[in-house]
């Protein structure tokens, strides 16, 4: 038997083939196997099929690799994963090589240029080749989630190939920003911000009475500004209250304003691997209606807040670990305060929400409708305050005599307080009250 011959050639009675008993036994075993093993794809074995499709697919694969290299930019990210950057209909799309979107892109290239479909094996070989090119020949580029610094400019991704450019002199919406952002299927397009809003108007949607709860007001509004600073460990928002205190509405409003998603609130995952996936895909995660937290879960939240490393198995077929370091914004709500471990309490902003009296309750649909109508101005107010806070930090006028835990955040929140019309002492006083709640 010659290499590359398949069992079906031996069954052709018009040819004489001399085989030994051992070879015959091997052939019989092969013929008894499933078709995928006994008669592999022509592209796998190297054999040319009767219709020449194997050669056609091989040629098509080579041509598609050349086309992709010509029309797309191949690069790898900070986690050494390959991507293609494609200019398409006036905007730039990023596809992670090996993803479902990337497979659709390859299929479209084949159809657009040749009017042919790709075999699964051809797709696999194209994918493997382009992944290696992106990893070993492509440039390393950072991919960001929702916000990013670049040369003193802060960028906020709106999710529709637009971003907000924030500087010390103001902000503007920019088409096709120079920063590359990750996007995921759950993500929703953020509204375009507009000027002229008042951030304090947000409190009416959050069951916070500024006359009675000024400290909570200051802590929350400064948080909404400072949370957009990337790579700074932020405190965890921890609202709690009895049923009817609008905890879930509070969480949905915050999530929508900062990091809009189809997944507004989520349950805490049972496995650490699921949590890593969530951290990779969300800038702000809201865990809803928690009853308690185990020691492991408390530790995970602390690590996710401060950016300590998580490891995740790359493939079940090997022992390679992928190391992830995320500093994520987190919100945890429950009937009682679920942050009970000292390390987690030290990293939390505690908000005790009171039940809304029956005569003052408004259904959530109405609240969210009103919020969505005002959201562009609220978002614009955040960016205006953030621009002022950046200018204050640049001028060096923010100084803290005693730096609390999460000191970098406290500096930004103090600048945000001044930008919003409060004083640094107002923020520090509210922050200290929060510490006292932790120790109560």
Explain the meaning of each model-derived region.
Residues 53-59, 206-219, 371-377, 402-404:
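Structural motif
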Residues 17-192, 277, 384, 388, ...:
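N-terminal nucleic-acid engagement/recognition segments and initiation subdomains in replication
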Residues 85-91, 170-281:
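P-loop NTPase catalytic core of nucleic-acid-dependent motor ATPases
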Residues 1-27:
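Non-catalytic accessory segments of DNA primases and related replication-initiation nucleases
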Residues 291-292, 302, 306:
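Catalytic acidic motif of RecA-like/P-loop NTPases
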């Amino acid at each position: 038997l010659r290499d590359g011959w398949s069992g079906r050639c031996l069954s052709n009675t018009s040819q004489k083939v001399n085989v030994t008993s051992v070879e015959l036994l091997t052939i019989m075993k092969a013929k008894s196997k499933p078709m995928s093993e006994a008669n592999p794809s022509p592209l796998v074995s190297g054999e040319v099929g009767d219709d020449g499709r194997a050669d056609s697919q091989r040629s098509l694969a080579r041509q598609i690799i050349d086309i992709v290299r010509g029309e797309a930019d191949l690069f790898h990210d900070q986690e050494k994963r390959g991507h293609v950057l494609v200019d398409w209909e006036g905007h730039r799309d990023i596809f992670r090589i090996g993803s479902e979107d990337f497979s659709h892109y390859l299929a479209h290239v084949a159809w657009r240029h040749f009017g042919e479909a790709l075999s699964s094996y051809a797709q696999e070989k194209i994918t493997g080749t382009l992944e290696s090119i992106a990893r070993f020949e492509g440039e390393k580029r950072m991919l960001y989630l929702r916000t990013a610094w670049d040369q003193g400019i802060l960028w906020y991704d709106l999710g529709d190939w637009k971003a907000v450019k924030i500087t010390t002199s103001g902000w503007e919406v920019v088409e096709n920003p120079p920063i590359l952002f990750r996007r995921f299927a759950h993500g929703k397009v953020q509204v375009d911000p507009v000027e002229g809003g008042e951030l304090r108007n947000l409190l009416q949607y959050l069951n916070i009475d500024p006359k009675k709860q000024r400290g909570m007001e200051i802590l929350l509004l400064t948080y909404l500004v400072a949370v957009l600073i990337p790579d700074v460990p932020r405190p965890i928002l921890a609202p709690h209250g009895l049923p009817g205190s609008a905890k879930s509405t509070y969480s949905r409003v915050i999530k929508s304003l900062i990091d809009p998603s189809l997944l507004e609130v989520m349950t805490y995952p049972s496995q650490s691997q699921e949590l890593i996936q969530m951290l990779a895909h969300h800038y702000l995660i809201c865990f809803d209606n928690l009853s308690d937290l185990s020691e492991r879960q408390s530790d995970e939240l602390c690590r996710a807040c401060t950016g300590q490393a998580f490891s995740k198995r790359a493939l079940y077929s090997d022992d390679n670990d992928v190391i992830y370091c995320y500093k994520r914004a987190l919100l945890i709500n429950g009937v009682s305060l679920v942050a009970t471990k000292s390390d987690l309490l030290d990293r939390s902003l505690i908000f005790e929400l009171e039940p809304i009296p029956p005569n003052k309750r408004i259904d959530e649909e109405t609240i969210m409708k009103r919020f969505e109508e005002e959201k562009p101005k609220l978002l614009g107010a955040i960016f205006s305050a953030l621009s002022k806070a950046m200018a204050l930090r640049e001028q060096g006028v923010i100084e803290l005599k005693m730096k609390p835990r999460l000191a970098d955040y406290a500096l930004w929140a103090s600048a945000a307080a001044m930008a919003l019309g409060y004083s640094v002492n107002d923020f520090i006083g509210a922050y200290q009250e929060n510490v006292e709640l932790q120790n109560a």
